[in-house]
Amino acid sequence: MKEKIHPKYNTATNVICACGNTFTVGSTKDNIKVELCAQCHPFYTGEKRMVDTAGRVEKFRQRYGSKT
């Protein structure tokens, strides 16, 4: 492997969820922000709630307008 071309690997990268939960993982990034984690995802919590903030179709309709 070539030397001095690989990114620096951080063993303590903070992952911050939108729900406020934080945990530490290893990554090449300093901080990672996510929308869902195991503490708030409906699959893990058993709650039924809408997760999608804006789907692809809605984004397309906002950008180009609905023809129907």
Swiss-Prot record:
Q: Which Pfam families match?
A: Ribosomal_L31
Question: What is this protein's record name?
Answer: Large ribosomal subunit protein bL31
| PANTHER family associated with the record | 50S RIBOSOMAL PROTEIN L31, CHLOROPLASTIC, LARGE RIBOSOMAL SUBUNIT PROTEIN BL31C
What biological function has been recorded for the protein in this entry? Binds the 23S rRNA.
**Transmembrane in keyword set:** no
Family named by the database record: Belongs to the bacterial ribosomal protein bL31 family. Type A subfamily.
> Which terms in the Gene Ontology molecular function aspect does this entry carry?
metal ion binding; rRNA binding; structural constituent of ribosome
Subunit composition and interactions: Part of the 50S ribosomal subunit.
Which example biological process does GO assign this protein? Answer: translation
> What InterPro entries does its record include?
Ribosomal_bL28/bL31-like_sf, Ribosomal_bL31, Ribosomal_bL31_A, Ribosomal_bL31_sf
Q: Name one GO cellular component term.
A: ribosome
Q: Residues that bind Zn(2+), according to the entry?
A: 17, 19, 37, 40
Organism per entry: Dehalococcoides mccartyi (strain CBDB1)
Tell me how the cofactor is bound: Binds 1 zinc ion per subunit.
> Which SUPFAM superfamilies does this UniProt record tie to the protein?
L28p-like
Cite the entry's keywords alphabetically.
Answer: Metal-binding, Ribonucleoprotein, Ribosomal protein, RNA-binding, rRNA-binding, Zinc
**Cofactor(s) demanded:** Zn(2+)
Recorded superkingdom: Bacteria
